[in-house]
Amino acid sequence: MNAKTLFVVFLIGMLVTEQVEAGIWSSIKNLASKAWNSDIGQSLRNKAAGAINKFVADKIGVTPSQAASMTLDEIVDAMYYD
């Protein structure tokens, strides 16, 4: 097999591989989007947000509702400058 034939086979293989990978990434993106927007995904995000608010409230000494309304800058200032 000469170099030109090998090069053509390599290019065709690359084109086929690129199309297959594009399909795989598209299906992964669709599955992740469905999982993120599902009821279970939303409830897990809400639980995580509640746990973060409770952790921050315990660290800086405020109520969880106050911690939820604070911006990130306020939280960092309260943790490191008080």
Swiss-Prot record:
Short name of any one Pfam family annotated for the protein: Antimicrobial_7
InterPro entries in UniProt: Antimicrobial_7 (IPR012526)
Signal peptide stretch: 1-22
Name this protein carries in UniProt: Vejovine
Task of the protein: Displays significant potent antimicrobial activity against clinical isolates of Gram-negative multidrug resistant strains of E.coli, P.aeruginosa and A.baumanii with MIC values as low as 4.4 uM. Additionally, it displays low cytolytic and hemolytic activity against human erythrocytes reaching 50% hemolysis at 100 uM.
Tissues and organs where the protein is expressed, per its UniProt entry: Expressed by the venom gland.
Location in the cell: Secreted; Target cell membrane
Family as reported in the entry's similarity comment: Belongs to the non-disulfide-bridged peptide (NDBP) superfamily. Long chain multifunctional peptide (group 2) family.
Maturation-removed propeptide residues: 70-82
Miscellaneous comment in the UniProt entry for this protein: Adopts the characteristic alpha-helical amphipathic structure in TFE solution, but an unexpected random coil conformation in water.
UniProt keyword terms in alphabetical order: Antibiotic, Antimicrobial, Cytolysis, Hemolysis, Membrane, Secreted, Signal, Target cell membrane, Target membrane
Biological process annotations from GO: defense response to bacterium; hemolysis in another organism
Annotated Gene Ontology cellular component terms: extracellular region; membrane; other organism cell membrane
